[in-house]
Amino acid sequence: GETIISKNKKPMQGALQDFTDQGWKVTNILNSMNLESMLRALKPHTPNGSVWAGALSYDLVQWTQPILLQHPPAEGEILAILWLVDSWDESEVIIPEVANTVRVEGEKSSHSDAEHAEIVKKIKQSITAGELYQLNFGRTWTGPLKEDPSTIFHRLAMNNPAPFSGYIEAADLGIALASSSPEILLETKDGEVMTAPIKGTRPRGSDPDQESLLRRDLVHDRKERAEHRMLVDLERNDLGIVAQPGSVIQSRFDVEAYANVQHLVSQITGELDDKKDGIDALQALFPGGSITGCPKTVVCAAIDEIEQKPRSFWTGSMGWIDVHTGDSTWNIMIRTLEARYSPEGWQGTVVAGGGITIESNPEAEVAEAIWKAAALRRACGWLNPEAISLPKGELGIYPLYLEQQPFIPEQRFDLNIAFIDNLDSFSHNIIHALKSFGCDVDVLDGRGGITEIDHDAVVIGPGPGRPEISPLSMHAASLDIPVLGICLGHQAIGINRGMKLIESPLGPVHGVPSNIISNGNGLLREGKHVMTRYNSLILSGNGEIEVTSTDETGVLPMEIRDGDTYGVQFHPESIGSPNGMLVFAEFLKRASHC
């Protein structure tokens, strides 16, 4: 479907309330055009030292991404709940003993297993067509609850402990959220910013040997590693929106073991730009890339089209923020029960899913979603205790080798670069790379009109879809100044020189380091290079341009050159491109001599 890009939206409305003898009373109405401005509007109402704590629904995506939802929440639906906290105690809480689960009938699923598998196939077709790289689809289970949601949360805390768990209940609104989340979206403190995305999953083993085998299988699984690499590149990009150039790094890479599952987890850190704070960071990162996909803007629109309903609080965030300092901590609400109260009692909603890539097996994705939801469904009483029995284990962390290695530029270039942003989730990684070499970078909207480019050089950025959707990219491909096209930009250059763009006959490749064979006439020196690819479409045929690098088969053009115009069908900025920064260095060196 079509991604509807819009920056002209209805404002989000917030109601400030005070608690009185008659209950909660509205004292002020706040209207804001995005999440950041809504939080800043709370400053006059927030004493120094106090924080706001609560939950943000995923559907606030309407005010963090430039899209219009086709299936928005109903008018007046609760999108966020925040309480002003003046003081708090830190203490050890003893979880009360919880009775055995009460079996409850009446659970319903939003999709049958067959329907779920067909959606996976449909997403893979979109990946093949070059519309996106990866998408996280959620399947929903709903049913009545015969226990208070707080009891279910205590059961989860006992049976499925997780580091970013939390419980929220707004009795007057009839909403309760019981989150047993292992994932942090964002932490900001004293000018530092951190996120720790999770992607890649295996169950726990029934014994230490099986546990080790499953962990090793996870670490060496091509699909899981590619998906995780893609997510790390995405989150580096999102942190790059608010961080100082050169400060964003992958600081940790581990397998983390929780009660029933093992995950690949990376920690990505950065230093906030002097003009940015934790509110800006939340605006940039929300919702988390691990539960949307890539490129984020396009997949958020695609999720809306495929799931055909609001997500509500699932994959939103629970946490707190100091609106004066910007210090904050937010989780991602996966492994979360959303409960709503009505005269008939509590009704529960549980959602689970996974990231769909070109290498996803539909039946395996269905099975993964089912066992991810099993612990919550069992805690709600919707599954028999013996159903979908999963091995359990102690929490553990197993460090892995970091792919991203530090890079210190040997040369700086006093160049003014125009960067054309084509709605990709890696754009800011490229911008940071250029700035790390001393360049000034002006960012131009690839979906905007053709504008004059009076710069020393231009970099046409990657993005979903075909390059023809960006008239500015096609225009820049013909300029008589140094040009570097990356992925979509590379394709724009090839089309401009008479080549055709087709679906790759060897299939899509996303997040996978690939061997690139160069003849030495382009930006790469002669020989073999390892670079990460994110492409489904490929240039084909003869054109008025030289192919300077191919894939290992010698069939697919990976690098092209026409004078001072260069195109690369790989991503030099990725953590999976060990010497990718040298590509930028060589281009800038040549541009500085023009």
Residue ranges of predicted features:
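Short glycine-/acidic-enriched loop or helix-start segments at secondary-structure transitions
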Residues: 62-63, 144-145, 241, 324, ...
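Short, glycine/acidic-enriched loop or turn micro-motifs at the edges of active sites
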Residues: 236, 424-425, 574
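Gly/Ser/Thr-rich beta-alpha loop segments that engage phosphate groups in nucleotides
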Residues: 56, 132, 291, 295, ...
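Flexible gly/pro-rich beta->alpha loop and the following alpha-helix that scaffold active-site loops
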Residues: 416-420, 424-486, 491, 497
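Short, hydrophobic alpha-helical segments
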Residues: 377-380, 384, 496-497, 587-594
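Amide-donor transfer/coupling interface in amidating biosynthetic enzymes
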Residues: 404-418, 448-454, 468-484, 502-594
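Extended alpha-helical targeting/anchoring segments
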Residues: 1-409
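Short beta->alpha connector loops at strand-helix junctions that form conserved
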Residues: 251-252, 445, 461, 503-506
